Design a protein with these regions (language model features):
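Short secondary-structure boundary/capping segments
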Residues: 16-18, 49-53, 143-147, 204-206
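Flexible glycine-rich, low-complexity coil/linker segments exposed to the extracellular/periplasmic environment
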Residues: 44-98, 102
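Transmembrane beta-barrel wall of Gram-negative outer-membrane proteins
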Residues: 84-202
Length: 207
């Protein structure tokens, strides 16, 4: 649910809107389900894509940790000896190779499990779910210009670029909810996790 008005139960830094995510924690029946979906994007699917080599953990959205700055990173490279600056830059992520390949259709998977348990005067319910999706986007021949003021009715360019932008976005989500209840009491244990990773490459031509 999206709330646009402030109320007492919302955080103090409420600005503009507040999103409340309500997850189910009562299993209606014992069941297991698996779903698969795919989709096509005009101008992207089956077209040529270019991205960095990356790391295996990029496939589940956790590649950022492999690209973190080394320990003892200087606050300003300009104030250290040139050789020290050169040595430091060699420690930064070295995976700059570029792969060129054909974009496959977007892939989406989800798995869910619901189960109920009877415990004398209590009932125990579990809902678990995992979902995963990955997809590509390609934006070709995008104009990316910066202008000065007009002169004689013509645009004066500071920069005039043509960009090709390629992206791969991966989303991983998980849900693990437990509910223990009786006629008079209820105990809930809710877990909700989301991870999103984006790899992008911009190919730019111009001046």
């Amino acid at each position: 649910m999206v709330y646009k008005s402030m109320s007492a139960e919302f955080p103090a830094d409420f600005t503009g809107g507040f999103v409340s995510i309500l997850t189910q924690n009562t299993a209606v029946d014992n069941q297991v389900s698996f779903q698969y979906g795919t989709s096509f994007i005009t101008g992207t699917t089956f077209s040529n894509i270019r991205l960095l080599d990356g790391y295996k953990c990029d496939y589940i959205g956790f590649g950022a940790g492999k690209r973190s700055l080394p320990t003892n990173t200087p606050s300003d490279l300009r104030v250290i000896p040139i050789q020290d600056a050169v040595d430091f830059t060699k420690k930064i992520n070295g995976k700059w190779g570029i792969n060129s390949f054909t974009a496959i259709p977007d892939q989406k998977f989800s798995f869910s499990l619901q189960h109920k348990f009877e415990l004398e005067n209590w009932k125990l319910s579990n809902i678990s779910a995992v979902n995963y999706s990955t997809g590509y986007n390609a934006y070709n021949n995008m104009q990316n210009n910066r202008y000065q003021s007009y002169r004689d009715g013509a645009s004066q360019y500071d920069n005039k670029y043509i960009d090709n932008v390629y992206k791969n976005t991966t989303k991983l989500g998980a849900l693990f909810n437990w509910l223990l209840f009786s006629d008079k009491n209820k105990f809930e244990f809710r877990n909700f996790f989301n991870q999103r990773g984006t790899t992008a490459l911009t190919q730019r031509e111009g001046h």
